[in-house]
């Protein structure tokens, strides 16, 4: 009997490792499947989807801006994941970011606030020979010292552009507020003050308006608020903005694309900025902020809660809906008449697909608007690279400067451009 059992053990034992190897192989296959799915490795690359009217100017701009119409190729292993593109942008901004040297300017505002911006002179002559200044509005809570801004400024300087970068009110950690007010979603006061300073100081310069994310909302709202704001403006470029805070409100509470998690993380960052200025914001004699409940700020888990308890009160809005309605560029952007490039990414986890009907419809109706939608890029990522390591310069940087160059050439040589088309 024991001999028979021993024989059975000898017969079964060689099969046991084979079974375990099969389980390991299945586990590895499952992990690889999850990686491939989460990194979207099977997703193709493509050129940006362009929406615009068939006009002479648009033909010229698309022909003169090949980076906009050629295939955008992100890093192979992770670049097709909007989450990783967004995370890398949020964590490091850009790789090997340069440190351009500029001068910090301080502008007193009528309400006692002090706007600041950094001014960077060009490092060469522009291809047109003209004096051209890029006026740049960064993303939420950002400023001129952020890596993605530094990279873009350095690249623009080398192309012959002067750059003026707004530091959002309260965003710089080493600059104290001088009034009980900080930046909001759509307040254009500081951006307007910076543009006004540039126009007065450099009376011959022409302007390129650039906005990133929240900065895109502010830039477009500023241009659309008053036709006079578009004087001496050659064009505007907006990247990764959401266009309507009211319509975005519901999407930010959804777990789709982990949007609720991003909402929590951004709210946590906003809390840190607000609390770093608690003495200036809540310690001064401010009738608008006396009803702000700091205990609700500490427990807030979404931007909407912070906006309702704190942000809307800076400008006396009676409700969150009123705040979002009046501070969104969707109600002003149709007033922009200068060439306007709107760039978004399909895999941006912060901007829901439903919001992209706004720029698409605008581009279909207005001759001066081009809407470019990429498959990949995340939120302000748009990294390029071969396999693993991204390049210092992003696709976004190249597109903005290339488009700006094309508009400048068009304005400089309009008769020749018309003849080339004919």
UniProtKB/Swiss-Prot annotation:
Listed name of the protein: Monoacylglycerol lipase ABHD2
A molecular function (GO) term: monoacylglycerol lipase activity
UniProt-listed GO biological process terms: acylglycerol catabolic process; medium-chain fatty acid biosynthetic process; medium-chain fatty acid catabolic process; response to progesterone; sperm capacitation; steroid hormone receptor signaling pathway
Function: Progesterone-dependent acylglycerol lipase that catalyzes hydrolysis of endocannabinoid arachidonoylglycerol (AG) from cell membrane. Acts as a progesterone receptor: progesterone-binding activates the acylglycerol lipase activity, mediating degradation of 1-arachidonoylglycerol (1AG) and 2-arachidonoylglycerol (2AG) to glycerol and arachidonic acid (AA). Also displays an ester hydrolase activity against acetyl ester, butanoate ester and hexadecanoate ester.
Location in or out of the cell: Cell membrane
Residue intervals annotated with topology Extracellular: 37-422
Keyword Cell membrane applies: yes
Active site: 213 (nucleophile), 348 (charge relay system), 379 (charge relay system)
Keywords of this entry: Cell membrane, Glycoprotein, Hydrolase, Lipid degradation, Lipid metabolism, Membrane, Serine esterase, Signal-anchor, Transmembrane, Transmembrane helix
Catalytic activity: Hydrolyzes glycerol monoesters of long-chain fatty acids; an acetyl ester + H2O = an aliphatic alcohol + acetate + H(+); a triacylglycerol + H2O = a diacylglycerol + a fatty acid + H(+); 2-(5Z,8Z,11Z,14Z-eicosatetraenoyl)-glycerol + H2O = glycerol + (5Z,8Z,11Z,14Z)-eicosatetraenoate + H(+)
Residues in AB hydrolase-1 domain copies: 134-385
Highest rank taxon of the organism: Eukaryota
Organism, as annotated: Danio rerio
Enzyme class per UniProt: hydrolase
Activity control mechanisms: Acylglycerol lipase activity is activated upon binding to progesterone.
Family assignment from sequence similarity: Belongs to the AB hydrolase superfamily. AB hydrolase 4 family.
Annotated membrane topology: Single-pass type II membrane protein
Transmembrane segments: 16-36
Cytoplasmic face residues: 1-15
Gene: abhd2b
Main location as per UniProt: membrane
EC annotation from Swiss-Prot or TrEMBL: 3.1.1.23, 3.1.1.6, 3.1.1.79
GO CC annotations on file: sperm flagellum; sperm plasma membrane
Residues bearing carbohydrate: 142, 285, 335, 344
Keyword Acetylation annotated: no
